[in-house]
A protein has these predicted regions:
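Glycosyltransferase donor-sugar binding loop
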Residues: 1-14
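Structural motif corresponding to alpha-helix initiation and N-cap regions
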Residues: 12, 30-34, 61, 98, ...
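Nucleotide-activated donor-binding/catalytic signature segment of Leloir-type glycosyltransferases, i.e.
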Residues: 12-37
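Nucleotide-sugar-dependent
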Residues: 34-39, 46-68, 76-84
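A charged, aromatic-enriched C-terminal amphipathic alpha-helix characteristic of glycosyltransferases
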Residues: 38, 113-144
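Conserved acidic donor-binding segment of nucleotide-sugar-dependent glycosyltransferases
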Residues: 91-98, 107-112
Length: 151
């Protein structure tokens, strides 16, 4: 079963046209942020599709860090610095290639141990590099450096 969170209303009309898929697709246009971990933890795979637009260039979606923290396999696109943030612990696809998305999902289900390890390593990477405590410490160090070089 597919669960789409944050899907545009137009997605529902596509699902409605595919009668055979209606029972297999659940759409939540928007959910409260506090409910997000519950939904993400129920997933087998987290997909974060980013299109290559002027809006997404240079942007790292916050949901990437949410996904990494859940220790689940992540499928996303190699736009901006997403590939660097994941550090090899995700599956990268061409944003304009739905067949590649389908094949990657099939691959993950055919290789569950690899997918599990990528998810766990993504979580570890997120904790070591992107946790708020780590970032706060690094920011304070940089501020101290600036303060001492300017005095």
């Amino acid at each position: 079963r597919w669960v789409l969170i944050g899907a545009a209303p137009s997605v529902q009309s596509h699902v409605d046209r595919m009668k055979s898929n209606q029972d297999r697709v659940v759409i939540f246009p928007k959910i409260p942020f506090k409910d997000l971990p519950q939904h993400l933890s129920a997933a087998d795979i987290l997909v974060i599709p980013q299109r290559d637009t002027t809006d997404t260039q240079g942007q790292i979606p916050a949901k990437l860090f949410d996904a990494m923290s859940m220790a689940k396999p992540i499928i996303t696109t190699p736009l901006s610095d997403i590939e660097e943030v994941l550090g090899g612990y995700g599956y990268l696809i061409d944003p304009s290639n739905p067949d590649q998305l389908a094949k990657t999902i099939e691959y993950i289900f055919a290789n569950p141990e690899e997918a599990r390890l990528k998810g766990l390593n993504a979580r570890k990477r997120c904790q070591e590099l992107y946790d708020i405590k780590v970032l706060k410490k690094e920011l304070n160090l940089q501020i101290e450096k600036l303060a001492t070089t300017n005095s």
